[in-house]
Amino acid sequence: SEMCIRDSGKAAAGLGMNKFAKDAPVHILVVEESMNITSFLGAKIKDKYFPLIDIGIATAHITLAAESEGLGSCILGWFDEKEIKKLTGIPANKRLLLDITIGYPAKDKRKKSRKSKDKVVSYNHY
C-alpha cells in the first residue's frame, strides 16, 4: 500500500543522510502488506517473493506518472524506518520499504552517460 505525506516535518524526519529530500513537497511511503494465502502459497511453489515484484511495478508506475506530469522523483530506501513509522502511525507489524519523493526539480537534468545497448542487452543467451 502507499501513503502520501504532505507534512514537511513528518516528511523530513528519519531521512538521515537524504537531507535533500526534506525539500520535496510530497513523499509517497510504500508499505509492505501481508500476503494473502494464495500469494503466499504461490510464492512458496515458485520460489519468488511476489510482494517485492508488485512493489517494484507500482514504484515504476508512480515515477513514470510523475515524469509524464513534468515532476521529478527520487526513490529512497535508506531512512530511519522506526522513526517514520512512529510519526506516521504505520503499524509496527508493517514494513516501510521505500519513500518516493515527488516535486519539481530544482534544476534541469544533466545528460546522463549510459552504457551502449550491446553492453546491457543480450538476445537468446545470457
Identify the meaning behind each predicted range.
Residues I28, A43-L87:
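Small-aliphatic-rich amphipathic alpha-helix that forms the alpha element of a beta-alpha
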Residues K10-P51:
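Helix-adjacent hinge/juxtasegments
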Residues F20-K22, I90-A92, K112-R114:
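Solvent-exposed alpha-helices and their adjacent loops that cap or buttress functional pockets
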Residues E83-G103:
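Short, conserved aromatic-histidine micro-motifs
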Residues L98-Y126:
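C-terminal helix-cap and adjacent tail motif
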Residues E32, W78, Y104:
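Short secondary-structure boundary segments
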Residues M3-I5:
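Short, small-residue-biased leader/transition segments that mark boundaries at the very start
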